[in-house]
């Protein structure tokens, strides 16, 4: 049969019979591995991944990134959907002794048809799949983002409202714990699979309905005859959905698709939550999704002895979180954050400042308490009781907003119209904004500025004014 690959291995850059390491065990890495298994073009020695310990065993070993020092290989192929972290990762690999010319990256391209043998199905083992249960079975394929899992819960809930007697499996790379945390109140959730894409590729056609949810929506498979057996109205809606997605007419590399999509939605008045409405199938009218709290963490939160009143801040974008060099264009500059904390403590010495983020995040001087790499259930409680959360556009903003905490959000490359919440205080400055996906990745400024104007123009003083107005009850 033929399968379509958005992420075609960079054959033109890697000589045949090379020994390669794939950096990144998510969707792209799994597609590269599958292509190498089918074609025998290269030998995959190993995966390396920052979150190596979150993946189930694979047919090739997976190691932490530092292991490249001891592995024998010819090339390292970066398996990223977007170029957001390419520069940072390349720099890290070079520091580990990997020559720049042995580090290979290519962005996603237009879909390419590859011939796949009929026996290329993934071994499903003894997994508990929704298609083995009575009723309508649905598979949803997610990406790896914390905030994305929150936003996509809205679509999950909409599907359940259309067909209450469905069971839904979610496939996601490395964030099953996050999804369980956010969806534990959903009785229609059957299972969550930590999957980089290989398992989904082998299973999605067995479901009554399979959808890929990114910034856009794709109908990968739909069995109308079976859907009609259970719910004729739902079957007709899903048929309409597939036709609408097919007629959307977005071609070319994924980065180009997203940029065009964002601007189409701007003209239609839709955003990250409401964009499915363009299909005529959904009627999403708000941004609200439920975020359950694990009661077992309440006592732990109460024992933290945090200041009676506090604000929360976040700095960092994944692999760049341990650096002050602001290698991610959408990051509010580290120097600005430190200056803001200084201004805030001078004005509100009695109010604490709590820093949240990943374990490797660099600490901001002047902060009263650090919770870096903490359990997500505990972070929920901390965010919920924060007076206000200061951040760039990202996952913690989605979480804090759904928990009812006001956020002051610094917007630059990412589009406020698409990713912003009207109830938050969304800040923009300078003369250009919204270039995200004009180029591939968050680390790229469309004007090639070392200090992107959009983010550097949002001064600590301005953020301080907004915080002060909000805390004094003068703000929106």
What are these regions (language model features)?
Residues 1-121:
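Hydrophobic, well-ordered beta-alpha structural blocks that scaffold small-molecule cofactor pockets
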Residues 32-34, 140-163, 337, 341:
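Histidine-anchored nucleotide/phosphate-binding helix
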Residues 43-50, 167-175, 354-356:
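Short internal beta-strands
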Residues 282, 288-355, 462-470:
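Core catalytic architecture of nucleotide-activated donor-dependent transferases building glycoconjugates
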Residues 325-413:
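Donor-binding and catalytic core of enzymes assembling or modifying cell-surface/extracellular glycoconjugates
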């Amino acid at each position: 049969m033929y399968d379509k690959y958005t992420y075609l291995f960079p054959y033109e850059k890697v000589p045949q019979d090379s020994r390669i390491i794939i950096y990144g065990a998510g969707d792209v890495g799994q597609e590269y591995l599958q292509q190498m298994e089918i074609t025998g073009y290269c030998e995959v020695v190993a995966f390396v991944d920052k979150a190596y310990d979150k993946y189930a065993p694979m047919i090739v070993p997976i190691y932490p990134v530092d292991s490249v020092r001891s592995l024998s290989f010819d090339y390292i192929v970066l398996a990223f959907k977007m170029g957001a972290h390419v520069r940072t990762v390349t720099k890290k690999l070079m520091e580990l002794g990997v020559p720049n010319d042995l580090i290979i990256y290519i962005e996603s391209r237009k879909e390419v048809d590859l011939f796949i043998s009929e026996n290329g199905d993934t071994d499903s083992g003894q997994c508990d799949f929704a298609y083995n249960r009575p009723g309508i079975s649905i598979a949803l394929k997610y990406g790896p983002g914390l905030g994305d899992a929150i936003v996509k819960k809205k679509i999950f809930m909409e599907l359940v409202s259309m067909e209450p007697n469905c069971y839904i499996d979610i496939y996601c790379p490395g964030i099953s714990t996050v999804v369980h945390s956010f969806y534990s109140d959903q009785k229609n959730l059957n299972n969550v699979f930590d999957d980089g894409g290989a398992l989904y590729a082998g299973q999605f056609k067995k479901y009554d309905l399979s959808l890929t949810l990114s910034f856009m929506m794709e109908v990968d498979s739909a069995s109308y005859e079976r859907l009609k057996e259970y719910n004729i109205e739902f079957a007709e809606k899903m048929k309409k959905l597939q036709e609408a997605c097919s007629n959307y007419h977005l071609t070319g590399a994924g980065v180009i698709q997203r940029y065009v999509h964002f601007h189409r939605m701007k003209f239609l008045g839709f955003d990250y939550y409401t964009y499915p409405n363009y299909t005529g199938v959904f009627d999403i009218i708000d941004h609200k999704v439920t975020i359950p709290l694990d009661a077992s963490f309440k006592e732990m939160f109460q024992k933290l002895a945090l200041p009676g009143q506090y604000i929360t801040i976040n700095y960092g974008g994944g692999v760049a979180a341990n650096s002050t060099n602001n290698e991610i264009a959408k990051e509010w500059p580290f120097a600005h954050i430190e200056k803001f904390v200084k201004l805030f403590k001078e004005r509100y010495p009695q109010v604490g400042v709590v820093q949240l983020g990943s374990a490797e995040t660099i600490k901001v001087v002047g902060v009263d308490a650090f919770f870096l790499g903490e359990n997500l259930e505990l972070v929920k409680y901390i965010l919920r009781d924060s007076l206000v959360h200061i951040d760039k556009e990202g996952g913690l903003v989605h979480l804090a907003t759904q928990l009812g905490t006001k956020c002051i959000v610094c917007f630059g490359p990412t589009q406020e119209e698409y990713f912003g919440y009207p109830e938050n205080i969304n800040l923009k400055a300078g003369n250009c904004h919204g270039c995200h996906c004009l180029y591939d990745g968050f680390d790229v400024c469309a004007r090639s500025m070392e200090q992107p104007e959009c983010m550097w123009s949002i001064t600590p003083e301005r953020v301080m004014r907004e915080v002060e107005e909000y805390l004094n009850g003068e703000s929106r």
